[in-house]
Structure formats: C-alpha cells, structure tokens
C-alpha cells in the first residue's frame, strides 16, 4: 500500500512545504492539497516549492474541478511542473464543492468532469484536442504523463470513474462504503471493456494517532460534515432509495446547512450533527495498532493508497507515528 498526506494550503506556505518534506522522509509517496483558492492559498504555486524541496514525492490536488481554471491553463500548469521535476504530478478531480460554492457556482455535471479529464490529460501528455471548435496542442511537451484520479460517491459518479478515470478517490475510510464503491467502479470498468485492476484505488480520510479517543473525535468531527455536503447532494438526487447505502446517508438527517469558512477545520460548528459512530467509521483514530488493523482491512478490499488528512492539533506526532509504526507494517 502507498501512503499520501493531504494538507490545506494555509499560510505560511513554508509550513506546507516543510510538512510535505517531512512526509516524504517518513515514507509517504504522495503529497496532496485542497484546491479552493479563495479559502486557501493557490496550490499550484506551492507545488513548485514542494517539488523542489523533495526528491520523489508525487504532488497534486485533492481535488480540483472543471470550473476552477481554464482547462488549457490546468493542463499547461501540470505539464510545466512535470517538465521541471520529472512527471511527479497527479490530478485529483471532482465536481467541485467548496471551490465552486464559495464563489456562487454550482458543482459541475459529471459529463463536464468526464470531458475535463480527457482534455486535460490529453493536453498535458502532448496530444491534440478539440476546444471551442479549434484543434489545440501544447507544442513543447515531450514524454509528459498525467493520471486523472476522480473522486465521487454516487452511482453515476462511480460509473464515470470506472469508464474514464485512471484512479478512484474515496474520501471515507469506512470498509463497508469502500467495498460498495470499489465494486461499483470495477463493475463499470469491466462493462466498458477496461481492466478493473488498472484503476488505482485511493482512500482518503483523517488520521490521528493517540489514546484519547474522545479528544480525537472532536478534532476529526469536521470530516463527517465535509462528506455530508456530498451526501446531501446524493440524498437530493436519489432520496432514500437503495441506490446509495444507508451507511453513507442516514447520518445527515440532522444536518442544518454548512459554513464554508470553517471547511476542513477542527471545531467546525457546522458539524455538531455528526455522531461519534460516524467519526469512528469514516476516520482512523486510536493507537497505532488500530490504524494498522483498519488499513489491512482496506488493503484486502483492493485499496492501493491511503492518504491521510492532517488537520488536527497533533500533526507532527501523527506523521511520525505513521513513519515509524504504521507504514512499515503495510509496505513490508
């Protein structure tokens, strides 16, 4: 199993760069950031500093969206970083939650996400595409490579992943939900004539190593609220039908709106509705052996990478614990 770290690009950017360097030294192979450039600093500027400070870390957004940047700009930015640092980027992409909503945009349609993945990948790898009834190709790219990993929860999103994406990002570490979503992605890939095993599976969730579970729950409760934004969209679309497992939908019944100014932050007041059970299921907490046990269960389901959100009050200790006690047991 590979390991990644997910950070918000809060100022000062040098702290983000330092943590990414520490993560690589601890055995992490991927460095991800949020991509909402109103709520946080512009990540692609910081990626250049991260790549310069590390030797092999693969860097990218978790996740960008089709509506945040012009697609040609996105492709050229990835291609420039790859040319400078040797194909060490990856593009996580979704419909757009915080990046869209804080500027008054709705999430993109799945068809738009599909088209964006194709255009950005082709451009970043040097192929010609049709844009606005014009053939476009970036002429200076040589041997470019960019994988597109798509995030999603609902049946149609999972189908889009299986049919078109290079990787699948599940922002939730509940094994029951992982089993259902991974199965749906692989079924869609198989039906489309693709190799299901060729799609990289990444589970992303907060992780906090320690013994004080009540405190850890309070620090990680924000994640249930963040996931709840996407679940609320699913419930609006599918209702209480069996199209989406109840393990994912039942807990948002008490949800009452969401304030993006606290997005992804410990102590988010919009997440008081999230019960302890959901924090325990969606996140990894407790001492190191509990993390190893959950990760082994996810690995048995076919998870190729675990990326941990490191937004709590004991980041350095958790990072060190993963490097010394957890990663070695999953990569041996």
Segment roles from a protein language model:
Residues 1-62, 146:
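N-terminal beta1-alpha1-beta2 module of alpha/beta enzyme domains
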Residues 3-7, 31-33, 58-62, 89-93, ...:
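Hydrophobic faces of well-ordered beta-strands that scaffold small-molecule active sites
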Residues 11-23, 74-77, 150-163, 220, ...:
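Short, acidic/polar
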Residues 20-25, 47-58, 78-89, 162, ...:
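Acidic (Asp/Glu)-rich catalytic clusters
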Residues 23, 27, 50, 81, ...:
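Conserved, mostly hydrophobic/aromatic
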Residues 30-54, 65, 97, 172-175, ...:
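Glycine-rich, proline-tolerant flexible connector loops at the mouths of alpha/beta enzymes
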Residues 44-64, 68, 123, 190-191, ...:
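Alpha-helix-loop-beta-strand connector modules within alpha/beta enzyme cores
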Residues 106-138, 183-184, 189-300, 332:
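An alpha-helical appendage that flanks or caps ligand/catalytic pockets
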């Amino acid at each position: 199993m590979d390991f990644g770290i997910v950070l918000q690009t809060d100022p000062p950017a040098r702290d983000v760069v330092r943590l990414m360097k520490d993560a690589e030294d601890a055995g992490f192979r991927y460095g991800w950031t949020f991509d909402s450039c109103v709520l946080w600093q512009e990540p692609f500027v910081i990626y250049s500093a991260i790549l310069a400070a590390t030797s092999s870390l693969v860097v990218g957004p978790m996740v960008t969206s089709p509506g945040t940047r012009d697609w040609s700009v996105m492709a050229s930015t990835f291609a420039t970083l790859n040319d400078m640092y040797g194909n060490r980027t990856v593009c996580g992409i979704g419909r757009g939650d915080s990046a869209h909503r804080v500027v008054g945009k709705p999430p993109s349609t799945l068809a738009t996400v599909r088209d964006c993945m194709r255009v950005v990948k082709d451009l970043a790898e040097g192929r010609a595409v049709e844009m606005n009834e014009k053939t476009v190709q970036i002429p200076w790219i040589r041997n470019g490579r960019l994988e597109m990993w798509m995030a999603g929860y609902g049946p149609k999103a999972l189908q889009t992943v299986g049919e078109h994406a290079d990787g699948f990002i599940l922002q939730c570490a509940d094994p029951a939900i992982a089993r259902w979503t991974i199965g749906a992605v692989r079924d869609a890939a198989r039906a489309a004539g693709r190799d299901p095993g060729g799609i990289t599976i990444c589970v992303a969730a907060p992780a906090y190593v320690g013994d004080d579970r009540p405190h850890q729950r309070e620090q990680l409760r924000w994640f249930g609220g963040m996931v709840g934004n996407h679940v609320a969209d699913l419930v609006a679309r599918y209702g209480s039908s069996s199209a989406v497992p109840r393990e994912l939908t039942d807990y948002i019944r008490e949800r009452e709106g969401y304030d993006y100014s606290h997005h992804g932050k410990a102590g988010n007041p919009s997440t008081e509705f999230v019960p302890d059970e959901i924090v325990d299921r969606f996140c990894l907490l407790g001492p190191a052996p509990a993390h190893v046990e959950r990760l082994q269960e996810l690995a048995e389901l076919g998870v190729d990478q675990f990326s941990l959100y490191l937004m709590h009050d004991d980041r350095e200790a958790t990072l060190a614990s993963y490097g010394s006690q957890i990663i070695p047991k999953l990569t041996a």
